[in-house]
Amino acid sequence: MAKIVDIKGREVLDSRGNPTVEADVILDNGIVGSACAPSGASTGSREALELRDGDKSRYLGKGVLKAVANINGPIRDLLLGKDAADQKALDHAMIELDGTENKAKLGANAILAVSLAAAKAAAQAKGVPLYAHIADLNGTPGQYSMPVPMMNIINGGEHADNNVDIQEFMVQPVGAKNFAEALRMGAEIFHHLKAVLKARGLNTAVGDEGGFAPNLSSNEDALAAIAEAVEKAGYKLGDDVTLALDCASSEFFKDGKYDLEGEGKVFDAAGFADYLAGLTQRYPIISIEDGMDESDWAGWKGLTDKIGAKVQLVGDDLFVTNTKILKEGIEKGIGNSILIKFNQIGSLTETLEAIQMAKAAGYTAVISHRSGETEDSTIADLAVGTAAGQIKTGSLCRSDRVSKYNQLLRIEEQLGAKAPYRGRAEFRG
């Protein structure tokens, strides 16, 4: 038994300079597992609650001392003496202690940090890498794959201070033979994109996730710039590299309309579905995230019926890693993929349940970071340990993003042929 003898919480900073929660879970043999909770900017209304202090005199109200106190008090008292290897029991005990639908009492940030720290401690106690322990918890021991990275190289929306409405423009090196080659391809495209933007006299400062954040004439202009960078890097768009969007449509859905302020265009749901379908015809876009507002289920159904047979339609704000909402979406034929962010639901156990439900229904699962990240690289192990096949963890700069890519390089080196990189086969259509 990996007996828990102490739990410590603390306030640390995320990549935006805002406080977040870190937890240590200490075992009787001296092993310490540590994990940090990430934080989002564009958040779904049904996400589990991130507990903030609201004290404007500290960190502009964004302190997390209440969540830390919950770790050092009630959560610690609850879990002392328990087995860190029994992930379900730990997570369910914390969920029960919280007693709310959205973890509002203890805070999803507090529960998640402890949940992940316990998993890390248990993996060390077993003498196995975290991805192997996660595969065991997932009921898929020894079944691994290296994920296709969805690299966010132009940032807009809530992730950047520019006039671009769509939040993320991503490249996917689907033609790579392994993850290391995929990472190299992405990095080369990123550097060529910088040169393309500079040649146009555009800003090459980066946004929250490390992508460039220039002012552009339209959303399609971002795609054209990326297409030029891919070509200049020596790759073939559509074969070696495909494209993906995260619209984060809930951020520009106003009064029942989709308002693209940067382009001066306003659409109803059917019109916006046509707009997105047009982009997929002109560019090899094989994945679109949050193409409709989280509450516009009729719009989502229309978009799914229109392009879902050939394009991966990912629910982020729509599903918020929540099995109850995902189940309803599956039953209604809404989308065909789920974005997995463990702080949306607040525990490792519930995260694994969402991945399992998605896969059982033939939906894909995309493991994702948040825009507010730390050096914690747990999502890399989660992607490999669940054989999810895809990961979103930002651009090719900023160490809060690159830490995940570097962990994936280490894992691929360890696993070799046991963790295949499947490229285009991981996507629909």
Curated annotation (Swiss-Prot):
<feature type="binding site">
    <location>
        <position position="392"/>
    </location>
    <ligand>
        <name>(2R)-2-phosphoglycerate</name>
    </ligand>
</feature>
<keyword id="KW-0324">Glycolysis</keyword>
<feature type="binding site">
    <location>
        <position position="341"/>
    </location>
    <ligand>
        <name>(2R)-2-phosphoglycerate</name>
    </ligand>
</feature>
<feature type="binding site">
    <location>
        <position position="167"/>
    </location>
    <ligand>
        <name>(2R)-2-phosphoglycerate</name>
    </ligand>
</feature>
<keyword id="KW-0456">Lyase</keyword>
<dbReference type="GO" id="GO:0000015">
    <property type="term" value="C:phosphopyruvate hydratase complex"/>
</dbReference>
<feature type="binding site">
    <location>
        <position position="316"/>
    </location>
    <ligand>
        <name>Mg(2+)</name>
    </ligand>
</feature>
<protein>
    <recommendedName>
        <fullName>Enolase</fullName>
        <ecNumber>4.2.1.11</ecNumber>
    </recommendedName>
</protein>
<comment type="function">
    <text>Catalyzes the reversible conversion of 2-phosphoglycerate (2-PG) into phosphoenolpyruvate (PEP). It is essential for the degradation of carbohydrates via glycolysis.</text>
</comment>
<dbReference type="GO" id="GO:0004634">
    <property type="term" value="F:phosphopyruvate hydratase activity"/>
</dbReference>
<feature type="binding site">
    <location>
        <position position="246"/>
    </location>
    <ligand>
        <name>Mg(2+)</name>
    </ligand>
</feature>
<dbReference type="GO" id="GO:0006096">
    <property type="term" value="P:glycolytic process"/>
</dbReference>
<feature type="binding site">
    <location>
        <position position="289"/>
    </location>
    <ligand>
        <name>Mg(2+)</name>
    </ligand>
</feature>
<dbReference type="InterPro" id="IPR020809">
    <property type="entry name" value="Enolase_CS"/>
</dbReference>
<feature type="active site" description="Proton donor">
    <location>
        <position position="209"/>
    </location>
</feature>
<feature type="binding site">
    <location>
        <position position="370"/>
    </location>
    <ligand>
        <name>(2R)-2-phosphoglycerate</name>
    </ligand>
</feature>
<feature type="binding site">
    <location>
        <position position="371"/>
    </location>
    <ligand>
        <name>(2R)-2-phosphoglycerate</name>
    </ligand>
</feature>
<dbReference type="GO" id="GO:0005576">
    <property type="term" value="C:extracellular region"/>
</dbReference>
<keyword id="KW-0964">Secreted</keyword>
<comment type="pathway">
    <text>Carbohydrate degradation; glycolysis; pyruvate from D-glyceraldehyde 3-phosphate: step 4/5.</text>
</comment>
<feature type="active site" description="Proton acceptor">
    <location>
        <position position="341"/>
    </location>
</feature>
<dbReference type="InterPro" id="IPR036849">
    <property type="entry name" value="Enolase-like_C_sf"/>
</dbReference>
<dbReference type="InterPro" id="IPR020811">
    <property type="entry name" value="Enolase_N"/>
</dbReference>
<dbReference type="InterPro" id="IPR000941">
    <property type="entry name" value="Enolase"/>
</dbReference>
<keyword id="KW-0460">Magnesium</keyword>
<comment type="subunit">
    <text>Component of the RNA degradosome, a multiprotein complex involved in RNA processing and mRNA degradation.</text>
</comment>
<dbReference type="InterPro" id="IPR020810">
    <property type="entry name" value="Enolase_C"/>
</dbReference>
<dbReference type="Pfam" id="PF03952">
    <property type="entry name" value="Enolase_N"/>
</dbReference>
<dbReference type="GO" id="GO:0000287">
    <property type="term" value="F:magnesium ion binding"/>
</dbReference>
<dbReference type="GO" id="GO:0009986">
    <property type="term" value="C:cell surface"/>
</dbReference>
<keyword id="KW-0963">Cytoplasm</keyword>
<dbReference type="InterPro" id="IPR029017">
    <property type="entry name" value="Enolase-like_N"/>
</dbReference>
<keyword id="KW-0479">Metal-binding</keyword>
<comment type="similarity">
    <text>Belongs to the enolase family.</text>
</comment>
<dbReference type="Pfam" id="PF00113">
    <property type="entry name" value="Enolase_C"/>
</dbReference>
